[in-house]
Swiss-Prot record:
The protein, known as: Phosphoprotein
Top-level taxonomy: Viruses, Riboviria, Orthornavirae, Negarnaviricota, Haploviricotina
Coiled coil start-end: none
Motif (Nuclear localization signal): 211-214
Biased composition (Basic and acidic residues): 140-157
Sorted UniProt keywords: Chaperone, Cytoplasmic inwards viral transport, Host cytoplasm, Host nucleus, Host-virus interaction, Inhibition of host innate immune response by virus, Inhibition of host interferon signaling pathway by virus, Inhibition of host STAT1 by virus, Inhibition of host STAT2 by virus, Inhibition of host TBK1 by virus, Inhibition of host TLR pathway by virus, Interferon antiviral system evasion, Microtubular inwards viral transport, Phosphoprotein, Viral immunoevasion, Viral RNA replication, Virion, Virus entry into host cell
InterPro entries tied to this protein: PP_M1-like (IPR004259), PP_M1_C (IPR037199), RABV_P-like_C (IPR049506)
Family: Belongs to the lyssavirus protein P family.
Gene name linked to the record: P
Annotated GO CC locations: host cell; host cell cytoplasm; host cell nucleus; virion component
Modified positions (Phosphoserine) in chain numbering: S64, S162, S210, S271
Region of interest (DYNLL1 and DYNLL2 binding), ranges: 138-172
Length: 297
């Protein structure tokens, strides 16, 4: 009788798939419960209404009065919705920014590049501010008197940022402890730190948030892992990803970033489960190969 041998790595990969499937089912069930929360209340039946309410009827005179009340209520609603001239214009600006954010998300879903969307959005915001927040008369002398203070604050902020950048990040410390090769220069090519770079990194990570990547396991096999299993906020993932050498430069140029390397970096610093599963030496070599391949393109 022939025997069938099963590769242990295939079993582990199957178990990982089952675990991810269970997590997906739980997430779908939670979303369904949240979406149906308004249906869990007890419905109101007409038969259960008080006896007095069944006897109500409206005369023509009462109908006319009711129409006047409705018109007054509509007028009051408009007054409440519209802002008075004396109210803070910053609230209008906040509402405008909220609408801009919704528009950016829609454009990104349609497939447009974020850098192009952001450049157009910046111009629109600048024009909005210049129209709705004109400089009041007599402000020039006030601005001159505050220029020196602004420069001093800017210098202090720059010094604080330089001190923070000089300190090793949590991900870098964990990677070095995990026998990372010394050939990786952890602090190189990460000087350009602006919002457009962060947005580009976040865009690429979000596109592959549920994609599974192969990583070497301690049992001489492989296991699958993705960004969803980190259970981290996207902003926190982007902050950790910026510490990977070369990522900010690639994002600034609009090039693809090594997502498997970024995932391994962030997971090694923040996921205990990942640390228990992964073979650190092989992971370090894979991360180095990914970095070399992407930065040489």
């Amino acid at each position: 009788m022939s025997k069938i041998f099963v590769n242990p790595s295939a079993i582990r990969a199957g178990l990982a798939d089952l675990e991810m499937a269970e997590e997906t089912v739980d997430l779908i069930n939670r979303n369904i419960e949240d979406n149906q929360a308004h249906l869990q209340g007890e419905p109101i039946e007409v038969d259960n209404l008080p006896e007095d309410m069944r006897q109500f009827h409206l005369d023509d005179e009462k109908l006319s009065n009711l129409g006047e009340m409705v018109r007054v209520g509509e007028g009051k609603y408009r007054e409440d919705f519209q802002m008075n001239e004396g109210e803070d214009p910053n609230l209008l600006f906040q509402s405008y920014l909220d609408n801009v954010g919704v528009q950016i998300v829609r454009q990104m879903r349609s497939g447009e590049r974020f850098l192009k969307i952001w450049s157009q959005t910046v111009e629109e915001i600048i024009s909005y501010v210049s129209v709705n927040f004109p400089n009041p008369p007599g402000r020039s002398s006030e601005d001159k008197s505050t220029q020196t203070t602004g420069r001093e604050l800017k210098k202090e902020t720059t010094s604080i940022l330089s001190q923070r950048e000089s300190q090793p990040s949590k991900a870098g410390m964990v990677a070095q402890v995990a026998s990372g090769p010394p050939s990786l220069e952890w602090s190189a090519t990460n000087g350009e730190d602006d919002l457009s770079v962060e947005a580009e990194i976040a865009h690429q990570i979000a596109e592959s948030f549920s994609k599974k990547y192969k990583f070497p396991s301690r049992s001489s096999g492989i296991f699958l892992y993705n960004f969803e299993q980190l259970e981290m906020n996207l902003d926190d993932i982007v902050k950790e990803a910026k510490n990977v050498p070369g990522v900010t430069r690639l994002a600034h140029d609009g090039s693809k970033i090594p997502l498997r390397c970024v995932l391994g970096w962030v997971a090694l610093a923040n996921s205990k489960k990942f640390q228990l599963l992964v073979e650190a030496d092989k992971l370090s070599k894979i991360m180095q190969d990914d970095l070399d391949r992407y930065t040489s393109c």
